[in-house]
Amino acid sequence: MARTVNCVYLKKESEGLGFQLYPGELGKRIFDNVSKEAWALWQSKQTMLINEKKLNMMNVDDRKFLEEQMMNFLFEGKEVEIEGYVPQKDDE
């Protein structure tokens, strides 16, 4: 049976992650409070951020920026802002 969590992002009970994907205390917080669906949404935003802002994951400042964006997105409900990005309309 799948593990469920009360997802802070989706604000509902949902299937949890299979294992802790992020290290440390923040990783435990994500594992305990973020659903698989919300994590997938974050991953797509993360990919867009890395590509559009040309972030280098070997750079400590870039990793810190990405972690801040992740916490804002998952726990504070703040949308990731990517310059020039226009979401596709449902009728397209």
From Swiss-Prot:
GO terms for biological process, alphabetical: cellular response to oxidative stress
Keywords, sorted A to Z: Iron
Cellular component terms per the entry's GO annotation: cytosol
Molecular functions per Gene Ontology: iron ion binding
Highest taxon, organism lineage: Bacteria
PANTHER family found in the cross-reference section: FE(2+)-TRAFFICKING PROTEIN-RELATED (PTHR36965:SF1)
Record's function text: Could be a mediator in iron transactions between iron acquisition and iron-requiring processes, such as synthesis and/or repair of Fe-S clusters in biosynthetic enzymes.
HAMAP family: Fe_traffic_YggX (MF_00686)
Similarity annotation: Belongs to the Fe(2+)-trafficking protein family.
Protein name: Probable Fe(2+)-trafficking protein
